[in-house]
Amino acid sequence: MIPGSNPGGRIHNVIEMFENYFMDAVKGYYRHLAIIESQDPLEKINSLIDDYLKVNKKPRVIYGFHPWLDNSKDRMKELKKRFENFLDIDYSNSEKYLGQSADLVILDAMDDFRPNYIARFVDMTKGGGIAIIYSDNILEGKLYKKSLTRYGVVKDLFEARFIELAKRYRGIIFFQGNDRITFTPYSSNETHKPYKKIPKSPKVSMELHELCLSSDQNKVLEESLFIMNLGKRVLVITAARGRGKSASIGLFLSYLMSEGNFGSIIVTSPTYYSSQEIFKFIIRGLEALNVKYKVITSRDGKIMKISTRDSRVKWVSPDLAKNEEGDLIVIDEAAAMGIEFLDYIVRSWDKVILVTTIHGYEGSGKAFLKYVDKLKGKVLLKNIKMDYPIRYAKGDPIEKFLFDVFLLDAEPHEVEYNGKLKIVEVPQEELFRDDDLLKSVYGILVTAHYRNSPDDLMLLGDMAFQKVIVGYSSENPVAVCQVVYEGGLTDKQIWDISNGLKNEGHLIPHRLIKYMRALDFGKLKGWRIMRIAVSPENQGKGIGSRVIEEVIKMAKGVDWIGSSFVADYSVLRFWIKNGFLPVYLSSIKNEELNGYSVIVIKALSERTKEFVVKLSSLLKDKLLRTSHQVYYNLNPQLIVLLLRNTYSERIEGEVPDLYVDKIKAYTEGKVPYNVIAEAAHFLVTKHFLELKADLSIEAEASLVARVLQGKSWYHAGLMLGLSSREVEDNVKQSLGVLLETYT
């Protein structure tokens, strides 16, 4: 180990020692990470680069920064002069570069030390390469950290843990100030390079196997042939990041296109960039097979469609994918799409390929794996797991560091709930002081929610205006609730929000002020339950409700408790069961989360109750008037749940006699539905405003899908898991019941 200090500032002599370590990294195909915290970091960066260039004379370089900040372009240009192959990337656009790799990756952290960017860029580093993060001071003057700061108060718990682990882990070079270096070497003897393993008699073309970089990729090519057999089939590919799963599927799709077995293939993903590697490798595969193809690109250069003589593959957004038809659909980053979406696709298509990351910086796939287990009993399903990384060797020390410092694979202890629950607030300092406790608590959050990111861990540690409440059973955490203080805004803050300015620290007041124009709501003080999670083996035992009950007791001097989450039937039902009412549903789908945001509130003061009545009645009115347009793709059962649990401040008049006669004619089979559509709409609207009839959730969802959303019988059936005939039977019978009730 290099000593922790280097007296006299003779840092160049120490840096010269790294050449041998860099050579060993090339041999073992593993990476180094250098973290430089210094007022003059460029001198140290250049010295490290000098040593690295002795090992790799013409490296590919990726440089991440915020180009719009003072001096950032000057720093970038100073380093760019040294290289021929240099790509500079704006942090804000870095998602576009998923799948890119480089020998040398440099992160400018002078203005922003953001976990998401660190994880994404360091992951771009190839085996034998080095990632360099440089900053003047990791703790101060950083953009993401400012978003966690309120009234000048913020903590440093995330950074303290980051620095501590960086100094302790091997393969990491840590410079602090002008004369301190911490570094413990790694060895090529501890790594295993990826290797291809082509079957002796492959069924998939040898040219495609030759393009593979690992035995796992060869395995995917051969075993994916499962999808070509007769009958309804689901193929699942799971892996950690960097295993080449998207590339493997791209090569396999090129094989299908060359064979002409599937004329129309759809690819969808949370964003286009999640699946761009699939399209790159379709092209590489087709070229290796000497198959002629045509490419259609968007104005900004995205490959949207690839066609051969007998086949075509195109990317479509998730919403449009619901209404597409074809021979095969591929869903990349499937776990991010939500179980409801996946269920719809699996019901609608005979051939489905689900590709997803497990334990990556984009989230945990635990809920997805549970879904896959349930599917096994319903359809023919094959799950292929990929273990070997292709960008670097197995055993790479930097992957180990990233997983541990960002808790990417954190999992809670399996604890059998004994019926006794101790619920306490755990100070953030205690949480970050005890790594086992932190892993267990964060693991519960990660396993319960797919969309986690390294940023979430920094928020948990650094944001001061929050509570972390933990439920223990047998001395082990089984539930976690993260509460953020919101509201109590000044007139100036309310004016700013109402005029379009951001206020990220107050999510619920922000949405209700900006979009519902409930300006005075901002003055009320509230607690937003940012996350509540129960360990997987203990869900469905009432633990979450017990925790919420305790949180309500803790909320002294608070006007409201609320939560905001992606609209999901079971999640919304949980909140309603615990006395929370929906007051807001976003009008635009959050593409990143693949859903609409819902806000629920439990009023703890009379003033809040007035707002809840008003806002929830406006929400009901909006759903009744715009489900055919704004909420056409929303789950009809979810709409029913919202309509049944919101207030009504208006009523419809009596049902006109003409409408009664028309609906009777329809229920008796004398006229088709389209003839009586306006009468049905009037009657269904009246029902949800007055809620006097007792209908099943399936019956009401059928009414919502056909009457309020305007779906065809076929698409209504797909949404509800029913046949077209079953949906129409539900609608006829339900309209008959409503006539009896409201006339």
Curated annotation (Swiss-Prot):
| Catalysed conversion reaction | cytidine(34) in elongator tRNA(Met) + acetyl-CoA + ATP + H2O = N(4)-acetylcytidine(34) in elongator tRNA(Met) + ADP + phosphate + CoA + H(+); a cytidine in RNA + acetyl-CoA + ATP + H2O = an N(4)-acetylcytidine in RNA + ADP + phosphate + CoA + H(+); a cytidine in tRNA + acetyl-CoA + ATP + H2O = an N(4)-acetylcytidine in tRNA + ADP + phosphate + CoA + H(+); a cytidine in mRNA + acetyl-CoA + ATP + H2O = an N(4)-acetylcytidine in mRNA + ADP + phosphate + CoA + H(+)
Main enzyme class = transferase
- Give any Pfam family that matches: GNAT_acetyltr_2
CDD domains given in the database record: NAT_SF (cd04301)
Gene3D superfamilies hit by this protein: 3.40.50.11040, 3.40.630.30, P-loop containing nucleotide triphosphate hydrolases (3.40.50.300)
**Does Methyltransferase count among this protein's keywords?**
no
Binding of ATP occurs at Q217, R391
UniProt subcellular location? Cytoplasm
Q: Which residues bind acetyl-CoA?
A: I532, A533, V534
Task: Name the gene for this chain.
Answer: tmcA1
**Protein name stated in the entry:** tRNA(Met) cytidine acetyltransferase TmcA 1
As recorded in UniProt, its EC number(s) are 2.3.1.193
Q: Which InterPro entries match?
A: Acyl_CoA_acyltransferase, GNAT_dom, NAT10/TcmA_helicase, P-loop_NTPase, TmcA/NAT10/Kre33, TmcA_N, tRNA_acetyltr_TmcA
A molecular function (GO) held by this record is: ATP binding
UniProtKB keywords: Acyltransferase, ATP-binding, Cytoplasm, Nucleotide-binding, RNA-binding, rRNA processing, rRNA-binding, Transferase, tRNA processing, tRNA-binding
Homology family: Belongs to the TmcA family.
HAMAP family attached to this UniProt entry: tRNA_acetyltr_TmcA
| Domain N-acetyltransferase: start-end pairs | 421-605
What is this protein's function per UniProt? Answer: Catalyzes the formation of N(4)-acetylcytidine (ac(4)C) at the wobble position of tRNA(Met), by using acetyl-CoA as an acetyl donor and ATP (or GTP).
